[in-house]
Amino acid sequence: MLMMFYWSLPCFLFLMGVFVFVSNRKHLLSMLLSLEYIVLNLFFLLYIYLNLMEYLSFLGMMFLTFSVCEGALGLSIMVSMIRTHGNDYFQSFNVL
């Protein structure tokens, strides 16, 4: 019963993060925050899986390293867009 709770809570939180990501598409910063929330829930699921299967824990550290790099890259893109366009609204600039 407890193991089912360990799997269902991160899955529910992941789905809530995806819902926020899909429904809140006006600002780039809110989208980046919801992406970081999704990555954090994926790390929680990975941590549970690695502890359950008794794998090595360095895979979790690699995942966190790549997610931090993804967050820094997203913030640098946001800063460059704010410098060129003046805000982080998606409607004010054409990315394509």
Curated annotation (Swiss-Prot):
The keyword Transmembrane applies. It catalyses: a ubiquinone + NADH + 5 H(+)(in) = a ubiquinol + NAD(+) + 4 H(+)(out). The gene is ND4L. Its EC number is 7.1.1.2. Its main location: mitochondrion. This is NADH-ubiquinone oxidoreductase chain 4L. Pfam families: Oxidored_q2 (PF00420). It comes from the Eukaryota.
